[in-house]
């Protein structure tokens, strides 16, 4: 269990994350938070949901997934698709999502289990899963 003295601070360091939506912080290197004896800093967004940090997938994997999603959904080239893009917000229904997963399987030479496929909601989710499966496969 960690403890902190009054006036101490915690420093969180991170490598660059994959591309994020405009207005979001990317390439975060460190964050310092003041800590007192009676309270511990909270990493919450203004909406009250916990902040989500996902840096597993390489930026090039996220970019490739973005291209595949655009192609499968027949989106214009200038459409904004990034790691935070939800398939549903891009107009994808469940059949479109299955087709996206099939396109990803073909492109990356992987096999996605049905249970894993159902958990994919965003481009980042797909890219993270691909990296995980590629790592298991030994690529």
Swiss-Prot record:
Keyword Nucleus assigned: no
Annotated Carrier domain residues: 59-134
SMART domains to which the protein is assigned, alphabetical: PKS_PP (SM00823)
Pathway(s) where this gene product acts: Lipid metabolism; fatty acid biosynthesis
A GO CC term assigned to this protein in UniProt: chloroplast
Keyword list, A-Z: Chloroplast, Fatty acid biosynthesis, Fatty acid metabolism, Lipid biosynthesis, Lipid metabolism, Phosphopantetheine, Phosphoprotein, Plastid, Transit peptide
Post-translational note: 4'-phosphopantetheine is transferred from CoA to a specific serine of apo-ACP by acpS. This modification is essential for activity because fatty acids are bound in thioester linkage to the sulfhydryl of the prosthetic group.
Keyword hit for Transmembrane helix: no
Function per UniProt: Carrier of the growing fatty acid chain in fatty acid biosynthesis.
Family named by the database record: Belongs to the acyl carrier protein (ACP) family.
Protein name: Acyl carrier protein 4, chloroplastic
């Amino acid at each position: 269990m960690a403890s902190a003295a009054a006036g101490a601070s915690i420093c969180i360091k991170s490598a660059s994350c994959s591309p994020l939506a405009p207005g979001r912080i990317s390439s975060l290197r460190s964050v310092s938070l003041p800590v007192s004896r009676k309270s511990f800093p909270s990493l919450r967004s203004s909406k009250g949901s916990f902040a989500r940090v996902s840096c597993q997938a390489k930026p090039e994997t996220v970019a490739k997934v973005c291209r595949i999603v655009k192609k499968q959904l027949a989106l214009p080239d200038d459409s904004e698709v990034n790691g935070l893009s939800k398939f549903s917000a891009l107009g994808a229904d469940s059949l479109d999502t299955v087709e996206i997963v099939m396109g990803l399987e073909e492109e990356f030479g992987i096999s996605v289990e049905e249970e894993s496929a159902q958990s994919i909601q965003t481009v980042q989710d797909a890219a993270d899963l691909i990296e995980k499966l590629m790592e298991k496969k030994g690529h």
